[in-house]
């Protein structure tokens, strides 16, 4: 089952990981070993989850690094599909 418009995975970090535990962005950044700006950009949908961040999120909150990356991939693909009609490619096979 695919979602037509999956949310940015940074929202999952904010609403499923940080807020339920009462963790601020500053505290979360320290837990994850990243800068406050990096985590702030992620939870405000301005940055993507990298493979390294996926590992950090898994170590801190669980869920599996692969799951975090799948959330990001689903979001990225949905964004790209919005513009698929503008992509001009000649089919060769």
Where are these regions (language model features)?
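A short, Lys/Arg-rich alpha-helix, primarily the initiator
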Residues: 1-23, 70
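DNA-binding alpha-helical recognition surfaces that contact promoter or target DNA
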Residues: 41, 55, 70
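Short, charged recognition helix plus adjacent turn
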Residues: 63, 67-93
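Short alpha-helical DNA-recognition segment
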Residues: 22-41
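Alpha-helical DNA-recognition elements
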Residues: 41, 45, 74
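Short, basic-rich loop-to-helix N-cap that marks the start of a DNA-contacting helix
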Residues: 46-59
